[in-house]
């Protein structure tokens, strides 16, 4: 039985089924039938809060700098699991046409029940389908969400190509895959559990039991045990999470170099990591001008690689890809900014109030002038005012407006050209 294979473009692979793609699909489906994932509880009514990556206007603005023109986007949740993301996508995009697919019938049933209880199931088309087979779906999609799925495929290149083929011109694709450096201890434990399971590999309940027994018996100062207790134990109290992490039959982990090559092979454009604060050098280099200057001399992907090497807490990559043509606005042109119409980002927790959480749930206290400006932006687009009109009655200047844009508190609609 083949446990580890590092030959796939330098990516770290964990699989027992390297030569049997159908077996991989069946094994992954069986895991999620046994342990539907993610195991978040259901609720009657909308899910709490938001994830701006699942709010099409916010995601599109992150990728392009402007709010989208589409009033009824088509959204695909590719590998929807138990429907947590699907539920948010439906509530955050009430005018969207949404399709959700997954290979696991058991997991898909949970997703349907979740969305039924929250009141949005009638707006979602659910279908049991492999990512490899998305060509069976009609039409193209303006936004595709694929979180925690591609790294569990036998052939991620084929999976990404399949998704790319369904992305409409100007469409955006959000992806979440594992990072190899931050998951080194996880890979070691995966292989240890598999060795002890032997021929019982594929009995996921046995794998969970063996894994928990290992952790309970390892010395308290053992590195694998410490990592589990310090980083993962809280979420891994749930067997579904423990199974997904330690007894998954198929996993491929990336580093920034293999990620770059994978993206380049897709024919899509890299639009940035959605957790952009993690990729800022200041949090690692402090006040060192020497390190900052050397950092600035590197290429974009060399910078990413350096940050990855210096921060072993990076356990995943989340990022957007897009299909051209995609507009790009940086709002550096004053005239262009003055004629644009700002609208308040709907992903602001605590609004209306001066004390809010921004789209990334960071606390933010608005000044009186900022609050007044956002109040004026909190109106339908057909009655929205331009930045120039708003500044006539505001003490803010263009620099302050640009700060609101950078913090994703407002989204901008360019003037008609």
UniProtKB/Swiss-Prot annotation:
Protein name stated in the entry: Uncharacterized protein syc1184_c
InterPro entries: Methyltransf_25, SAM-dependent_MTases_sf
CDD domains noted in UniProt: AdoMet_MTases
Any one GO MF annotation of this record: methyltransferase activity
Family per similarity comment: To M.tuberculosis Rv2067c.
PANTHER family: METHYLTRANSFERASE (PTHR43464), SLL0487 PROTEIN (PTHR43464:SF91)
């Amino acid at each position: 039985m083949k446990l580890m294979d590092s030959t796939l473009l330098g990516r770290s692979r964990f699989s027992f089924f390297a030569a049997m793609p159908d077996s991989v699909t069946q094994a992954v489906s069986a895991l999620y039938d046994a342990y539907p994932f993610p195991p978040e509880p259901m609720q009657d009514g909308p899910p709490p809060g938001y994830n701006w990556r699942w709010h099409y206007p916010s995601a599109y603005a992150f990728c392009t700098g402007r709010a989208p023109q589409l009033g009824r986007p088509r959204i695909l949740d590719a590998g929807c699991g138990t429907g947590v993301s699907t539920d948010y996508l439906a509530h955050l995009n009430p005018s969207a046409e949404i399709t959700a697919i997954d290979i696991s019938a058991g997991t898909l049933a949970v997703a349907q029940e979740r969305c039924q209880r929250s009141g949005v199931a009638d707006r979602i088309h659910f279908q049991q389908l492999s990512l490899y087979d998305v060509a069976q779906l009609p039409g193209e999609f303006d936004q595709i969400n694929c979180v925690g799925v591609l790294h569990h495929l036998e052939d991620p290149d084929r999976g990404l190509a399949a998704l790319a083929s369904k992305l409409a011109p100007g469409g955006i694709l959000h992806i979440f895959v594992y990072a190899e450096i931050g998951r080194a201890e996880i890979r070691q434990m995966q292989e240890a559990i598999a060795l002890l399971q032997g021929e019982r590999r594929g009995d996921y309940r046995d794998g969970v039991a063996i894994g928990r027994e290992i952790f309970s018996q390892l010395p308290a100062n053992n590195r694998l045990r410490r990592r589990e207790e310090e980083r993962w134990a809280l979420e891994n109290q749930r067997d579904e999470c423990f199974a997904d992490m330690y007894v998954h039959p198929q996993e491929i982990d990336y580093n920034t170099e293999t990620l770059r090559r994978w993206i380049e092979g897709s024919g899509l454009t890299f639009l940035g990591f959605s957790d952009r604060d993690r990729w800022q050098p200041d949090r690692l280099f402090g006040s060192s001008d020497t390190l900052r200057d050397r950092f600035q001399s590197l290429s974009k992907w060399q910078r990413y690689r350096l940050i990855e090497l210096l921060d072993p807490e990076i356990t995943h990559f989340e990022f957007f890809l897009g299909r051209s043509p995609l507009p790009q606005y940086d709002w550096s042109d004053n005239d262009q900014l003055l004629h644009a119409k700002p609208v308040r980002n709907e992903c602001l927790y605590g609004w209306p109030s001066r004390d809010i959480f921004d789209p990334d749930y960071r606390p933010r206290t608005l000044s009186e002038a900022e609050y007044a400006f956002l109040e004026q932006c909190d109106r339908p687009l057909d009655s929205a005012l331009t930045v120039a009109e708003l500044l006539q009655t505001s003490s803010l200047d263009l620099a302050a407006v640009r700060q609101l844009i950078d913090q994703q508190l407002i989204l901008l609609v360019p003037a008609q050209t």
